């Protein structure tokens, strides 16, 4: 069988990774066609669907029906929603469910959900039988443009976010844009922060386009699919150039060093801060820190902050509800960042909008002094 033809309102992004190459399909109605798209690409006839309690009532039945129609026998596991599900405890639960479903190497684990479910299910797919097929059906904007693409999987520990995991590329990504209409405005904005990130890394024209087209993206106009496709292509290009994050892929972590520290500081409490909001604040801080180090103009930092604020995203630590722990606690979280090498702090800094770079010898004293100025305490 061959994959179905791309519809007029869809986009396809191909990720050319040799034997591990895969397609990202972007457009409305893809969940209903998932069975056909999967069966056209994978030999296996079994699947284990991993989802969460928020997504399951909306899309699980439709996905199961579609798989059955195309001859794929599927079972499902529904987990609690939220960042705390990315744990060893739930990883064991997922692995047990996949093995109980008798999923073999040519069969598939299907992640139906946002980034949490994708990271967790992908980790399980990477280690069960030393690797089974994996299909991402991301249901949030953030997961459609970021976490579903590139093969990073993992869980959180008490030491920090995403510190235990494997690289396991998906075999197919189905980004059904129709599901985005069910997201809360807050969740949609949080995902949009990752869209902005691609412009700030090395695509200034994309950032300027986003400034003009945010309203059309928000309301589901033609710019929405264009923004998602551009983001997926940007990430695919980086992943192909540096799959295992030994070089340029680290640029995708713009805003994430500060952001992850803030997530840890709020104990991953989504009522206070969700991942995309942490990234938004982190990107502003990265631009401000770059300006402080005389690497970039303060005007660029102000422009980034202005756009994110206009969208409705938090842009300062003061925007986070509740008290934050002291700067020393934030510094301890930063010291656990995956990009730390030889004990030296590594940040993604910038020379301006669309001019990000890896700075691999940042003085901790400079970071601590900067955070002390920005800390609301």
From Swiss-Prot:
Q: Which reaction does it catalyse?
A: 7-phospho-2-dehydro-3-deoxy-D-arabino-heptonate = 3-dehydroquinate + phosphate
One example GO MF annotation: metal ion binding
Entry EC no(s): 4.2.3.4
Q: Which cofactor does it need?
A: NAD(+); Co(2+); Zn(2+)
Annotated residues for binding of Zn(2+)? 194, 256, 275
Do the record's keywords include Cytoplasm? Answer: yes
Q: How is the cofactor bound?
A: Binds 1 divalent metal cation per subunit. Can use either Co(2+) or Zn(2+).
Cite the annotated pathway.
Metabolic intermediate biosynthesis; chorismate biosynthesis; chorismate from D-erythrose 4-phosphate and phosphoenolpyruvate: step 2/7
- A biological process (GO) annotation for this entry? amino acid biosynthetic process
Alphabetical keyword list: Amino-acid biosynthesis, Aromatic amino acid biosynthesis, Cobalt, Cytoplasm, Lyase, Metal-binding, NAD, Nucleotide-binding, Zinc
Q: Known Gene3D superfamilies for this protein?
A: 3.40.50.1970, Dehydroquinate synthase-like - alpha domain
State the disulfide connectivity.
none
HAMAP family in alphabetical order: DHQ_synthase
Q: Which family does it belong to?
A: Belongs to the sugar phosphate cyclases superfamily. Dehydroquinate synthase family.
Name the job this protein performs.
Answer: Catalyzes the conversion of 3-deoxy-D-arabino-heptulosonate 7-phosphate (DAHP) to dehydroquinate (DHQ).
Name-wise, this protein is 3-dehydroquinate synthase
Taxonomic source organism: Agrobacterium fabrum (strain C58 / ATCC 33970) (Agrobacterium tumefaciens (strain C58))
* Lineage per the UniProt record: Bacteria, Pseudomonadati, Pseudomonadota, Alphaproteobacteria, Hyphomicrobiales
Q: Which gene encodes it?
A: aroB
């Amino acid at each position: 069988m061959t994959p179905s033809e791309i519809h007029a309102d869809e986009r396809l992004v191909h990720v050319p990774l040799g034997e591990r190459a895969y397609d990202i399909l972007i457009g409305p109605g893809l969940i209903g066609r998932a069975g056909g798209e999967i069966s056209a690409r994978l030999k296996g006839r079994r699947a284990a669907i991993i989802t969460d309690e928020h997504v399951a009532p909306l899309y699980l039945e439709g996905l199961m029906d579609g798989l059955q129609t195309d001859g794929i026998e599927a079972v499902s596991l529904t987990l609690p929603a939220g960042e705390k599900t990315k744990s060893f405890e739930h990883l064991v639960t997922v692995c047990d469910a996949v093995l109980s479903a008798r999923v073999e190497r040519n069969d598939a684990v299907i992640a139906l959900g946002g980034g949490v479910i994708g990271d967790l299910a992908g980790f399980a797919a990477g280690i069960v039988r030393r690797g089974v097929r994996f299909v991402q059906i991301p249901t949030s904007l953030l997961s459609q443009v970021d976490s579903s693409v590139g093969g990073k999987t993992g869980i959180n520990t008490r030491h920090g976010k995403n510190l235990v995991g494997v690289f396991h590329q998906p075999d197919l990504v189905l980004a059904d844009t129709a599901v985005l209409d069910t997201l809360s405005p807050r969740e949609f904005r949080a995902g949009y922060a990752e869209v902005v990130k691609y412009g700030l890394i090395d695509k200034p024209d994309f950032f300027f386009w986003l400034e003009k087209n945010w309203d059309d993206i928000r309301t589901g106009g033609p710019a929405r699919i264009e923004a998602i496709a551009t983001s997926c292509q940007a990430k695919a290009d980086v992943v192909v150039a540096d799959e295992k994050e030994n070089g340029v892929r680290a640029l995708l972590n713009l805003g994430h060093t500060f952001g992850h520290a803030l997530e840890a500081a709020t104990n991953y409490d989504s009522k206070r801060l969700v991942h995309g909001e942490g990234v938004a604040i982190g990107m502003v801080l990265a631009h401000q820190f770059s300006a402080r180090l005389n690497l970039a103009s303060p005007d660029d930092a102000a422009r980034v902050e202005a756009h994110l604020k206009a969208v409705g995203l938090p842009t300062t630590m003061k925007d986070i509800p509740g008290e934050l722990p002291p700067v020393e606690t934030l510094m301890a979280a930063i010291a656990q960042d995956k990009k730390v090498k030889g004990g030296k702090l590594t940040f993604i800094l910038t020379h301006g909008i669309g001019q990000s770079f890896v700075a691999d010898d940042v003085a901790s004293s400079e970071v601590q002094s900067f955070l002390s100025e920005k800390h609301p305490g």
